[in-house]
From Swiss-Prot:
Residues the entry annotates as binding Mn(2+): K220, H239, D277
Pfam families: PEPCK_GTP (PF00821), PEPCK_N (PF17297)
Source species: Sulfurisphaera tokodaii (strain DSM 16993 / JCM 10545 / NBRC 100140 / 7) (Sulfolobus tokodaii)
Protein name, UniProt field: Phosphoenolpyruvate carboxykinase [GTP]
Record-listed GTP binding positions: G261, S262, G263, K264, T265, S266, R369, R400
Amino acid sequence: MYIMRSSFNFLNLLVSDKMIKKIEILNNSYVEEFIEKTAELCNPSSIYLVTSEEDKEYIRRKAIETKEELPLKTLGHTIHFDHPLDQARARDDTFILTDDKIPFVNTKKREDGIREVLSLLKDSMKGREMYVGFYSLGPKNSIFQHLAIQISDSPYVIHSENILYRLDFDDFKGNKQFLKFVHSKGELDIKKRRIMIDLKEDTVYSVNTTYAGNSVGLKKLALRLTIAKAVKEGWLSEHMAIIGFEGDKGTHYFTASFPSGSGKTSTSMMGKLISDDLAFIREINGVARAVNPEIGVFGIIQGINSKDDPIIWEVLHKPNEVIFSNVLMTEDGYVYWEGSDDKRPERGINYEGFWSNDMNKPASHPNARFTVPLTAFKNLDENYDNPDGVEIEGIIFGVRDYDTLIPVVEAFSCSHGIVTIGASMESARTSAVIGKGDEYEFNPMAILDFMPIHLGEYLGNYLEFCKKLKKVPRIFGFNYFLKEGNRFLNSKEDKRVWIKWAVKRVEGSVDVIYTPIGLVPYYEDLKTLFREMLNKEYTIEDYEKQFTLKLDKYLEKNERILKLYKEILAPKEVIAELEQQKERILKYIDKYGKRISPLDLR
C-alpha cells in the first residue's frame, strides 16, 4: 500500500488514529497530499474527516458550538449570519487564474493569483479545526459523476455541503483524481476576500468570506471547473434546473436556465423536481440526458409566501434540516423574511445585529437564503438520483425583461435557440450579485458570471453538442416580467400556462404562428389553457399586449448582441444565426411596421 510517510508523520500530530485509518483505507496518494499541503499551509489545531452520517452529526454540533449557526425553535432549523458586506457572490474578488485575457472573465495571472491567495491562507486556520469532506457531484456509479473534496475551517460551510451534496468517501479508493476546494473564513476581512479558481489544477481557493456562493466550493465555484471540463470533453455543465412536467402523454423533462431571482426556483416547483439550479447533460445514444450534481437546494427566500410558493413554504415550516441565512431571527426563536405572510415581528436579530420595525429597514437581506435537502420536497421526482439521468425534451431560457420580450417563444431549431435565445439573454440584475439592482446586463445562458473560458469556445461546444443528437430538444424563450408602465402584464401563476404550452409543443398537440423571432402560440390555445388551468378568462386584449412583437426593440437587441459577438470573434455559426434573424426582422418591419400582432400573421 502506498503511504506518504512524511504526510503521516505530520498528520499524526493533528488527526486521530481513527481518522488516519480512514486515510490508509483509501490508498490514494492524491488525497493524502492534498490534506497534508493544506494543513501545512493553513496550520489548524486539528483535522476532522467527514465520511459518514455520524460525522454529519458532529458537524451539526460544531456549527452550533462555534455559533456559526444558532438553533431555532423548529426541530432541525438553524440560522446563519454572514458579514454585512458578504451577502452575495463577490464578482470583483473572484478570479480565473490564467495568463490569457478572456472577454467577460475576471482573470489574474496564475502565478500572481496563487501567490496572493496562499499568503492569505497562511496560518488562516490557526486555533481552529480543519474539516475535510468527501463528495460526489452527480449520482454515484454514474458516467456523470465527478468526485470532490472540500476543506474548510467553517462548520457552516461543511454543514451546507453535507445537505447539498452526496457524501461519498468510498469512491476515493485508489489513486482517483478529484476537484479540490480550500476555504478558510480567515479574519472575515472583506478587503482581503479572495476567490481564486485554478483550472490547471482543478482547485479553488477561497478566503475571508462565508457567504455560500463564495465559500461552498461544490456550488458555483465547482461550476467553473466543470464548465471547462465539459467543453474539453464534449458535454454540458449548465446553470439549469431539471423539471418533469406532466403532459397528456406522460412526463416530459425540461432544463430551465434563468438568471438568479428570475423564476428558476418557482418554475422548478411547477413540476416534478430533479434540480432547481444545476445540470450535467450528456449525449447518450443520440439523446440528451441530464442529472443534478446536487441533492439539495440553496434558494433565495425573499418573497416566498404560502399562496405563491406553497411547496417551499411547507418545507420551510416543517421540522426538517434547514439552514436559514441572513433572514431575521425573532425573539421567540423563529424566522421572518421580507415577503413572508407570517406576521411582521416588532424586533429581532439579523445580519446587521439588532433590528426593530421602527428602524425603517428591511428585516432580511434581499439575497437571504435557505439550504435544504431535496428529499424535503413533496414534488421530488423519483429519478432525482438516477445514475442514467433523464431524457431532456425541452430547454427553457428565461429572462427578467420588462420591456421587449414576449412571454413565450419557441426557436426554429436547436442552433437558432442556442444563439438567438440562450446566447442573447439580457436580464435585469438582481441582488444575488453585489452591484446595482435592476440594471440590464448581458448574461448568456444565465452563466456568464461562472464562465471560466472564452464565451465563443463555450457556445461552439453547445452547437456541436446539438449536432450529435438524433433526438433534439425543443428550445423555448420565457419572460415572466413583461410590463405595461409599472404594471406586470402577467400574474405569478400565469407561468403554468406558458409551461403547459411548451409541453404541448413537445407532444406535438398544438400548432404555432411563424414570426421573424420564432414560433408563438395561437390565442385560442392560450385561452383554452388559461380556462382549464387557472379558471381565468384570457382576453384577446391580454394576448395582444403580451405577444405584440416590438420589432424595433428586437432589432436593437439583435444589433447589440451581433456587435458583441463579432468583437469577441465568436464562431461563424453564431454570427450567421444572428444575421439571419436580423434579415427576417427587417423584412417584417418593411412589410408590417415596427409593431406587429401575431393575429396579423395567421
